[in-house]
Amino acid sequence: YRIQNMKVLGEDKVIGRDVTVREMIEEVEKDRAYYYRSGGGITLSGGECMCQADFSRDLLRAAKERGINTALESMACAPFETIETILPYLDLYLMDIKHTNPAKHKEFTGRPNELMMENARKVALSGKCKLIIRVPVIPTFNDTVEEIRGIAEFANTLPGVEQLHLLPYHCLLYTSD
């Protein structure tokens, strides 16, 4: 994954920058007192962290070595062998489940959901971290009582899942004249 040069409001902008695990953990360390007082820590999220699984694993490991709590937000679309490498360094997995129907999931997201559902089961069965299922509630896709009930029933079959979070859908649209 490369740093991107983009046009933002007509101007060239560099979006993001390359960083090392050391640089990231030094930044994280600045808030250590806050993490200690609040019981918080770091959460890897935004985009799909498992697309950079080695970096994610190394950053989570560095945080755990320093006694910092760790969490990952992901839709679990990577092979389980990849996910398994981060589990020893993870306290909490915030896993997105968008739909229980593979065909509808594929129609909406471009990929079926069987791998993600199986990974949810494997993470739960591993017992290596706490697992919270999160559902972005999206109008006309999964906002029915039946679908939310189906996801809740699936989550209820996973050992150790104590919470299911329903997340409101945000549509950030703008028009230019």
PLM regions: where:
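Conserved small/polar residues in nucleotide/adenosyl-binding loops
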Residues: 174-177
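Short, solvent-exposed beta-strand-terminating loops
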Residues: 168-172
